[in-house]
Swiss-Prot record:
Inhibitor I9 domain sequence ranges: 26-104
Species of the source: Arabidopsis thaliana (Mouse-ear cress)
UniProt-annotated glycosylation sites, renumbered to this chain: N193, N219, N417, N666, N713, N761
Subcellular location: Secreted
Family: Belongs to the peptidase S8 family.
GO biological process: proteolysis
Documented EC number(s): 3.4.21.-
GO molecular function: serine-type endopeptidase activity
Protein name: Subtilisin-like protease SBT5.6
Subcellular location, principal: secreted
Gene from which the chain derives: SBT5.6
Amino acid sequence: MKKLTSLFPLLFLIPLLASCAEEKQVYIVYFGEHKGDKAFHEIEEHHHSYLQSVKESEEDARASLLYSYKHSINGFAAELTPDQASKLEKLAEVVSVFKSHPRKYEAHTTRSWEFVGLEEEETDSDVPRRKNDADDRFRVGRNFLKKAKHGDGIIVGVLDSGVWPESKSFNDKGMGPVPKSWKGICQTGVAFNSSHCNRKIIGARYYVKGYERYYGAFNATANKDFLSPRDPDGHGSHTASTAVGRRVLGASALGGFAKGSASGGAPLARLAIYKACWAKPNAEKVEGNICLEEDMLAAIDDAIADGVHVISISIGTTEPFPFTQDGIAMGALHAVKRNIVVAASAGNSGPKPGTLSNLAPWIITVGASTLDRAFVGGLVLGNGYTIKTDSITAFKMDKFAPLVYASNVVVPGIALNETSQCLPNSLKPELVSGKVVLCLRGAGSRIGKGMEVKRAGGAGMILGNIAANGNEVPSDSHFVPTAGVTPTVVDKILEYIKTDKNPKAFIKPGKTVYKYQAAPSMTGFSSRGPNVVDPNILKPDITAPGLYILAAWSGADSPSKMSVDQRVAGYNIYSGTSMSCPHVAGAIALLKAIHPKWSSAAIRSALMTTAWMTNDKKKPIQDTTGLPANPFALGSGHFRPTKAADPGLVYDASYRAYLLYGCSVNITNIDPTFKCPSKIPPGYNHNYPSIAVPNLKKTVTVKRTVTNVGTGNSTSTYLFSVKPPSGISVKAIPNILSFNRIGQKQRFKIVIKPLKNQVMNATEKGQYQFGWFSWTDKVHVVRSPIAVSLA
């Protein structure tokens, strides 16, 4: 009995010990808008009071605080236990509490601006045209850029991995004084001082508190990074120069690929750098960056206060989150309230449906499409079989070499399902030396496979897609001559190796080829709709070039992003929606310069309703299947900045309109001055330039309002036309809109109903059907996509 009694104190302590041992993590406590006009110290003390309510002492509360967001965003980031976070979430004024995590966000990793019609002319005449000028439909010459003053006066904030300030893309030669509206700073740090800012890079900051809380005090050796705004990676410099880089003659990637003039979309716009992404500690840079939510929110809060006009974010969540659990979404809403336009990448998880990032209707979500430029090499087998391949490898073969399949030349002990993958230390040098190796994609990085072939003494590599990769063949700066091939070609090569006694191969070097293929087409990697957070909002919004984009690079990183690679390049070719997003950000800067009073929603509308749905061959833009791409792939289409400057009509939306929309997705208490109505309008009635109606059972009436922004004669009449989704009736009431002044608004309804005589099979039920409608006068075509699924 005595022994049993002695256990009671221990039993009593177990829950207490468990509570003490409960792991602390970083949470963001979000309050929405600030109430009243409080000083910064008052706001921080208010945040401390909430922390103290769940902490054991004032010292503990202050030590746990990482950030107090004081400018536009009202909230804080702090170390909390799950129990403490749960208690805070129940308190008054708290909108949401959400956990940060290193794997919650990821970065979404020239000819491009010439292709869309924004190249800077070298002379005062548009003729003679240069050999590789883009099709007239994608070309505009000087007038549009001159009207926009090349973006001068507009400040673009880029939230990424920093900047390499020595790049020619960021020189300030001939630029005027820094805009008086600028309120930011040039934050100094390792290898970065105030002299690295200039009249081009007018501000730079870095945010590392969240990163250090997870990984410990910053260690330059382990982190392979700079504790400053300097970019160790290349991703940030690439995106920044794509948006607003200066024109640089004779730029090219390693090996001379894509040689020509490199320029951002708005080359005279000013650049503000917000470094919130950091190299993974003790890892190769090719594995990507870490972008912590609490650091990004601090960056957005500062960007708003600094006075940027545009924010470009080539980062997104790795899985969908409700808007109030997504720091980028919430930060962007506060930016939009200040009429800052936010463009963000759609993600690189395509072509699987429902994989999009950055789904909030106040964000311009950008997918990735192709250019008309390719890097074409060749593969010749000993039996005469020849095929063109994609290649940006600078290395060359002098003659045919024996050809082997990786599975036949591995060391003992490699797992059966990995023998074909050319993983590190898997190949047997005595069987590989001097030979071309067929390696298959799957596990391991593409660059790493080439490294392994080189380590084993191989003469070259054929990198074969597996079925899951489809027919989209990537190009990388490999360490050996390399040819990328499709699954069909892989089968032919394997058959040749199997049946020929002395198989051999020759890899031809790649070269830059223009007008190689119909463009644009959709990339396979670009994430696809539908919008899984709110299917009433059609996403993505638009698409822009994101494949094989040439732009500035970091002097601290090789083109392959591997530490053993000592090659250095001032410019690099990179792919991803990370690359398409800054294209749109650059276009936004130009539109802001021409129309400084336009709202963020008006600029989105102008870009979307003027986008192309056809390629340079005047055929529908294709998906990777070879079929016409639908709005879940390309949104409203491929962007046309010059047309967007004069869209005719726009679908505008105020900050309060976004708050009203928020009521439909259970965001009810962000702004203390706004209350949701008793009857909440459905999400599809938000005044968006596209329409999505999921699970249609009966007639649905969608409401929209357009504003006349036409130039010249203010009197105009627009007629309605429609191509309805299959099995759906779409009508407009009224079907004629007349305007007699600029700024005039007109309301209309779109009546959508299923056709009674439409017989659906089982596969059609629940599947989306697509169409479009437009308003047309004698000058403008204002086009909107439609996506409807039948219940």
